[in-house]
Amino acid sequence: MNRIAILSNAGSGRNARKAALIESFGGLTAVYQEVTRSAVDLPRALEALLARNPSVLAINGGDGTVHAVLTALGDRPAPPLAVLPAGSTNMTAHDLRCGGRLSRRRRALLALRDLPAETWPTLSRSPLALRCPDGRELRGFFFGMGMIVRGIEYWHASLRHGGGAGEWAAGAALLRVALGMLRREAPFDTPVQLPAVLDGDPLPPAPKSLFLASTMQRLFLGMTPFWGREAGPLACTWLSDRPQGLGWRLPALLSGRARFLPATAGFFSRRGETLSLTVEEPWVIDGEAYTDEGTLTLGAAPPQTFVALAGPGPGAKGAK
């Protein structure tokens, strides 16, 4: 029987609201769970789970929990990972074909105990590898500055609690920030000074209202705001200080329809291998805010195998 290791973040959105999922794993055959209640618990919990030599390591939490586990793992050997979408937005889980109803993903995870590993639906993804000015390396899937930070701040202040969790709430926060930019309301219209170099080529030095970089195929609500055609795993999109026609171009931006997003109007998107940024303001990776100032270097980490608990789909293999 395959052994399943589960790292559960008791503070993640759905887990914090209802502890039933965490409790449901107790006493199950070939299931080993460690529960964390703060960031300092994670290294010990991860070591305890890996010592079990599991067939799969499931992350029961949200985007920030996945980011924390990937960062803690670094480049060390690890079993295939799976994600139980127990956070508030669960953007990472959706992109890794682990999104949807939590009860169904739980059943799919537990079913792996009796299924040959070669039949599991899996996909291979390269997380972001972000090196901080002090030498620390973070792992995740999504980096953002500018209106991305403003949107997350607004979401935390106004929408996070009660019925405000989920992808739709994140979308509402993004629309609120876009409206604030159109109305030129502070702080939503505050641009960032962000000197950047992509694969040795300096980006335009003008202030940017938005900057994002990701190795994901889709963001929350299925958004794909990338249209660069260069080679490279790192997709980067940014907007000028005053992008022209943002209101009517917003649907095209969220779906990456290049013909409606000319650079002359302040819309840019490129792909590459290595991105260097000089930051003086807060930035986020997978929804977690950081205030480190200085030079950040972003690239793609080695590919990691994930089990697609929602079943096979584009980019997944197995379970035929």
Name each model-derived stretch.
Residues 198-205, 222-320:
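ATP/nucleoside-binding phosphotransfer catalytic cores, i.e., glycine-rich phosphate-binding loops
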Residues 13-17, 150, 219-221:
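Short N-terminal binding/cap micro-motifs at the start of the first secondary-structure element
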Residues 144, 148, 212-226, 289:
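Glycine-rich phosphate/pyrophosphate-binding beta-alpha loops
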Residues 42, 66-67, 219-221, 292:
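Short, well-ordered alpha-helical microsegments
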